[in-house]
Curated annotation (Swiss-Prot):
SMART domains documented for this protein: NGF
Region (Disordered): 47-67
Protein name from the UniProt record: Venom nerve growth factor 5
Keyword Secreted: yes
GO biological process: one example: nerve development
Cellular component aspect of the GO annotation: axon; dendrite; extracellular space; synaptic vesicle
Origin: domain of life: Eukaryota
Disulfide bond sites: 139-204, 182-232, 192-234
Organism: Tropidechis carinatus (Australian rough-scaled snake)
Length: 243
């Protein structure tokens, strides 16, 4: 009797051991796991493909500013445009490095040894420093590099597109403009500093000058005279009650 019980127990254990395992308990690397992985990867790839096709059919709208900058960015130009010295302006700089933000913070110097533009004018500025000997300016001005100028008025009064980036000899150069403007139209309550307020009304205003800059004309780059801020001057008006 005991032998029969042992035989049945052994047969039961052998049956359990020989039963197929579920997919949840299949060890990693078995055929069942590989099938699941392949199925999951296929579904993921299909989802990514569908998402990519949807993005291509419905591209994200770009900002107007980005579209405008993209139209004048990284344009390939002919190196011959830079061979004539008459096209060079002391307030226009082409460089692959950002210039200093202000001459008040650090000296404005030539920023790229490979570029031969604007070297002499900046050297002359630094060889004649201005010392504080009690002199005061009639108007307070601030000079900064303008790095994102895309529109300007040309010498004919038309609004033109200014190139931001250019591709010259496989190097991307950015066009910078050194502009000067008034810090405050009334540095003192009476207007300009040092004027006779009893007989004159005065105020400070920014004036502009034409410089040659690289602009877009159709689909080609060309030099044009454009207006930029270059100085801060004092305007005086005689008071009418003195007549």
């Amino acid at each position: 009797m005991s032998m029969l019980c042992y035989t049945l127990i052994i047969a039961f254990l052998i049956g359990i051991w020989a039963a197929p395992k579920s997919e949840d308990n299949v060890p990693l690397g078995s055929p069942a796991t590989s099938d699941l992985s392949d199925t999951s990867c296929a579904q993921t790839h299909e989802g990514l493909k569908t998402s990519r096709n949807t993005d291509q059919r419905h591209p994200a709208p770009k900002k107007a500013e980005d579209q405008e900058l993209g139209s004048v960015a990284n344009i390939i130009v002919d190196p011959k445009l830079f061979q004539k010295r008459r096209f060079q302006s002391p307030r226009v700089l082409f460089s692959i490095q950002p210039p200093p933000l202000s001459r008040d913070e650090q000296s404005v110097e030539f920023l790229d040894n490979e570029d031969t533009l604007n070297r002499n004018i900046r050297t002359k500025r630094e060889t004649h420093p201005v010392y504080n000997r009690g002199e005061h300016s009639v108007c307070d001005s601030v000079s900064v590099w303008v790095t994102n100028k895309t529109k300007a008025t040309d010498i004919k009064g038309n609004m033109v597109t200014v190139m931001v980036d250019i591709n010259l000899n496989n190097e991307v150069y950015k066009q910078y403009f050194f502009e000067t403007k008034c810090r405050n139209p009334n540095p003192v309550p009476s207007g300009c500093r040092g004027t006779d307020s009893r007989h004159w009304n005065s105020y400070c205003t920014t004036t502009q000058t034409f410089v040659r800059a690289l602009t877009m004309e159709g689909n080609q780059a060309s030099w044009r005279f454009i207006r930029i801020d270059t100085a801060c001057v004092c305007v005086i008006i005689r008071k009418t009650d003195n007549f």
